[in-house]
Amino acid sequence: MSASAQTQMRNLQGNHACALAAVAAGCRFYAGYPITPSSEIAERMAGELPQVGGVFIQMEDEIASIGAVLGASIGGVKAMTATSGPGFSLKQENLGYAMGAEIPCVVIDVMRGGPSTGMPTRPSQGDVMQARWGSHGDTVVIALVPDSVAEIYSQTIRAFNLSEQLRVPVVVLIDEIIGHLVETVAVPAPESLTLIDRKWADSPVDTFKPYAINGDDVPPMPRPGAGYRTHTTGLTHGEDGFPTQDPVLVAPMMDRILGKLERHRDLVDC
């Protein structure tokens, strides 16, 4: 098949490109709360997800939105939310939870002027440091920063791939300008995309350790309904997932969780 046959030229708004890319990447759950200038992402997801068997939920607030996304991801589906400014601030605790419990998800932050309520309809790039340092405890978060509508599409797909491959939350930083900008984008055919899905556990149920330290920085996830029993917590935990403060157990676990991004930096660096 020729390259031209694999792509479709479309005039897309940046926020719409983000939504379409998420669906193309396999996202089947979206929970969000309307907030300018990201609301078009939620609107588009509300229309797209039912067509592919996905679920869209408008939650009561920003904290509930990220909580629902983490629950859906644990439940076995690729999940995303989008927000801006003060909403991104409210999501930080659960972003840290996702890092500690190794729950893959994608968070889109369409940046606007701040601080506080700031300027909802004006652009800003003021959330870069928050994306990096927003959560406590030396949390490391991947942040991708597209600079065009075409890159919004490609980097949203990349965000899902990195999230699933490394079992981490991934943030995509857009701003109001490119979020609302309309450009002609070469949208690749779905069959031409390289998509990465999480590793699923296939070990015997009675010996399964959900956070195993076995030389692989990314342990497989238990598939819901497959008989695996697992405990998910934001507390420091051992390989079995249960809370512990034993330094003999905590030290290697934290090295694996916090160090895996540095050890796999080649996947992230452009």
Show the residue positions of the predicted features.
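Generic structural hydrophobic/aromatic packing signal, biased to beta-strands
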Residues: F56, C105-I108, A131, A143-L144, ...
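Short, solvent-exposed polar/charged micro-motifs at secondary-structure junctions
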Residues: A68, S154, V182-E183
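Conserved thiamine diphosphate
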Residues: R122-E176, W200-A201
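Flexible, low-complexity linker and terminal segments
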Residues: S2-G14, E164-C270
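Generic recognition of stable, solvent-exposed alpha-helical segments in well-folded globular domains
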Residues: A17, E40, E151-S154, V248, ...
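Thiamine diphosphate
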Residues: M1-W133, T139-V140, I157, E176
